[in-house]
């Protein structure tokens, strides 16, 4: 197991959104593992960025612990995991206490937030690779498409280049549920709506087989646990994040990706079924490689990525 690494904090002096709005002293929460190596100019040349999913933060790097530990594909890299723009810990409606006055943001804003942090904190303007899980994959793909010379390799995990169909509907439904709640409209925390929204996400995170294997009482208990966790979320964090996700569409841009790309998909993923997402995405990215595997954990099967360490070692090595 990965040793628990304490979070560190930094402030970006000024961050400007695509909209032109700006925030000052923008907080960034991050964690690092591994040792940095320096080139002849004294610049870190072995950085790999890990980007977490919708509900994660910088501690989510533990999901790829098997890759960062001794013997793992990333053991010789300096892995940096950042709590994304809009997520608690980094600049977000809740962390800044701006609430609804926090600027709405896009996936590109999330990418630029990471890029500016890397430059200001570490002097890094090019990384060895970017790994993104789920919504973190949205950022990784956008980064590679918008700034194709800034990374050597790209590993998108259980993700897509666009939000359509059931995923769009889920994000939209969650926002309607929260924004229509009487408590939210009255200016108080809509705990019930947040709880129900979290339960909804839980019911899509695992495979049908996983849910079928649970006793009804176990399923009810798991739903209640997720609901209790969800009730603690900030409504504007959720709404703003969902709005950013709903606008995610890299159609016509994937062809510009130059980084060597290795895509992972789970056959039982109910958010991003391979036939709708990872398979066509692999066909759109030049020379992309695709690995599909089975997991009863569905979307959360990404936690089993360590099983494919040797494939990743070979990929990073260019074999």
Curated annotation (Swiss-Prot):
The keyword Cell cycle does not apply. It is found in: Cytoplasm. The active site is at 269. Keywords: Acyltransferase, Cytoplasm, Transferase. Its EC number is 2.3.1.-. Pfam families: Abhydrolase_1. The keyword rRNA processing does not apply. Coiled coil: none annotated. Gene3D superfamilies: alpha/beta hydrolase (3.40.50.1820). It comes from the Archaea. One of its GO terms (cellular component) is cytoplasm. GO terms for biological process: homoserine metabolic process; methionine biosynthetic process. Residues 46-301 form the AB hydrolase-1 domain. Belongs to the AB hydrolase superfamily. MetX family. PANTHER family: HOMOSERINE O-ACETYLTRANSFERASE (PTHR32268:SF11). Homodimer. This is Probable acyltransferase.
